[in-house]
Amino acid sequence: MDTRQEDTGRPDESREGIRQMAVRQVDTREYVSVLREIAEEGKVVPMLISGSSMSPFLCHNRDYIYFTRPERELRRGDMVFYRRDSGQYVMHRIYKVKPEGYYMTGDAQTQIEGPLRREQIFALIVQVKRKGKVIRPGDFWWEFFEHVWIRIVPARRAVTALYSFLK
């Protein structure tokens, strides 16, 4: 059931009596372009995750990323926001840094994308909200995905299949 409706600026009552906020659909490129400008001013910008490429760490329409312009050298394991040559905006993790550019992958992926130029990368993710809990660098899950999960890209399918089997 699609609960999206025209934004009236006030919550609406659903049939179940639960108050819901109206959702406005906007063009993704336009929306992210505005957020990018804010991040490039040095502000931290929150954004709801859309898509499943960063699963199992981040889940579609549940978790949030918080990003800002990078103030340091980018390195393997960093989550970054970038714009592909096609104009599509993507948030993935740096798999490898080489002289010719940056190589990226999502946490749910085994394919490596790249090389990307440094100027395509406009933001560094500095914290996330996962299942309602804020996770920052230094926290267990942040460090696990940044340092361990990024190193097992070829084995990810087997690891996630085993996890699903054991659940």
Language-model segments: which ranges?
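Extended hydrophobic leader/signal-anchor segments used for secretion and membrane insertion
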Residues: 2-4, 9-167
